[in-house]
Every structure is written in structure tokens, then in C-alpha cells.
């Protein structure tokens, strides 16, 4: 990655679960953590040997309170670790030398749905600083479309049932398109909730998606049986839609 011009800001260090990870920045200053992969859809042959998104790190003000959403509602039910210290694998990032509490969550049951095999297993790590009380919310003074990360998004099936579940757990939808939102070549229903600190989480139920646009081949997922996977060959065919620089 260094040979390809990436700004690597830390060397590989062991995380609390014993695996190796390091951090780098993109040209806009966004932080990425590179971790050892546990699930692979296929080999792209890219020289970086990197896969797709495997998870996210989210800062919270009250970790125990935040677990209600991420563990109990979003079903990342297994705690890989729950530790409080100054962690060497964080030393390269701003504020990384401070004492903090970290809880990494994973889902033990494989996800189901049209794109589950492509997206693979994921994890969520919650971090609460215990030394610094003056913290900045990630969306403070930001607008949709600004450079950088916007929100965490989940591909879902059964939006109506999810809406009821979130309301019962105390996380009502703040936005709900209700019907299919037409995005031109694709379409679906989307909604948002907020965690205890106001961090945005989006749910998207895909209704229409292009498989091969040049051939006019689209697939309607609105009546797709719940939990059914799209064939692997079809998911691979979607790669021909990517924009090449």
C-alpha cells in the first residue's frame, strides 16, 4: 500500500483479540483500519490484496447504554472483547494514546438476504474514551454530501417488521420513504434511526438493481423470498457495472 501512495499512519499491531491491524488515510483524510479478513467472496486480483468493508468503529459516550442498540437490536450479539486500557494498535490515530474502553461485537449467525454472500460477515467496535470529556460528535457542522463518511447502512429485508421492532426497543424511524424510492437505475425503500448519541444508521431494502446495464438486465427483488441468496454468478456479473477511472 505504501508503494501505491497510501498514507499509512501506523504499523501492524495486535488488537485485543490477537489479530493484526493498522491504519491509513485516504486523500481526504478519512481513516481506514486494515484488518485480517475472515470472510471472502472472491479474489479480485488487486495488488493491495484488500477486500471490502468488514465493519466499523463507532465512538460512544456511554458504552453500556449503546449496547442496547448494537447488540440487542442489530443482533451483533457476541462480544469478542471488552477491555479498557491504552491500546498500541490505536497509537497512530489522533487521541489513540488515551485510555479508552473497547467492545468488539460480531454476529454468530450468518446473515441472510440477496446480497449476504457478497457483503460477508461484519463486526462493530464501540469505543468510549475515559480520559477526555470534551468530545465532538461526528456529524457536528456537517451536511449530507460533505467529504467523508456519512452514516452506517444495512441491507435489510422486511422493513415493516424491522420498523415495529425498532419502535418497541426505543429506536423509532426518524425517516421512512415508505414506498419504493426511485434512484434511476436502482430503487428501494430506505429508513433511518439514531443511536443514543445521534449517530445515523440507515436501513435499505433493495427493490430493483441492475445486473448488467449494457444489456438492460435488471432484477426485481421486491418479491424475493425472505432470506434467499442471489446466485454467486449473478453477484459477480454486477461487477461489470462499476465505473472505471
Describe the function of each predicted region:
Residues 21-45:
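Short, structured interface segments
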Residues 1-3, 20-25, 52-61, 106, ...:
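Vicinal oxygen chelate
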Residues 13-14, 95-104, 125-127, 133-138, ...:
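Intrinsic, low-complexity N-terminal interaction/targeting segments
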Residues 1-7, 15-19, 168, 178:
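An N-terminus-focused feature that recognizes amino-terminal "leader" regions
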Residues 6, 156, 171-175:
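Catalytic cores of nucleotide-enabled group-transfer and carboxylate-activating enzymes in metabolic
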Residues 59-123, 168, 184, 245:
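Core segments of cupin and vicinal oxygen chelate
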Residues 39-50, 208-240:
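A short, polar/charged loop-to-alpha-helix boundary motif
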Amino acid at each position: 500500500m505504501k508503494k501505491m501512495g497510501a498514507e499509512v499512519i501506523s504499523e501492524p499491531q495486535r488488537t485485543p483479540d490477537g489479530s493484526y491491524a493498522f491504519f491509513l488515510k485516504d486523500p481526504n483524510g478519512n481513516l481506514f483500519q486494515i484488518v485480517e479478513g475472515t470472510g471472502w467472496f472472491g479474489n479480485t486480483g488487486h495488488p493491495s490484496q484488500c477486500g471490502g468493508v468488514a465493519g466499523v468503529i463507532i465512538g460512544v459516550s456511554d458504552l453500556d447504554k449503546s449496547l442496547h442498540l448494537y447488540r440487542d437490536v442489530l443482533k451483533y450479539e457476541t462480544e469478542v472483547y471488552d477491555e479498557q486500557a491504552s491500546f498500541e494498535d490505536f497509537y497512530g490515530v489522533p487521541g489513540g494514546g488515551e485510555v479508552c474502553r473497547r467492545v468488539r461485537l460480531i454476529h454468530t449467525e450468518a446473515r441472510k438476504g440477496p446480497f449476504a454472500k457478497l457483503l460477508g460477515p461484519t463486526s462493530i467496535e464501540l469505543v468510549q474514551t475515559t480520559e477526555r470529556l470534551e468530545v465532538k460528535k461526528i456529524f457536528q457542522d456537517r451536511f449530507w454530501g460533505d467529504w467523508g463518511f456519512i452514516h452506517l447502512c444495512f441491507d435489510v429485508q422486511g422493513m415493516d417488521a424491522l420498523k415495529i421492532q425498532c419502535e418497541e426497543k426505543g429506536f423509532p424511524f426518524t425517516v421512512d420513504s415508505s414506498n419504493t424510492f426511485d434512484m434511476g437505475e436502482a430503487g428501494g425503500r430506505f429508513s433511518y434511526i439514531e443511536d443514543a448519541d445521534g449517530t445515523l444508521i440507515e436501513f435499505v431494502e433493495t427493490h430493483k438493481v441492475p445486473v448488467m446495464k449494457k444489456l438492460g438486465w435488471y432484477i426485481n427483488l421486491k418479491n424475493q423470498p425472505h432470506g434467499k441468496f442471489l446466485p454467486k454468478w449473478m453477484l459477480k456479473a454486477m461487477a461489470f457495472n462499476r465505473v472505471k477511472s
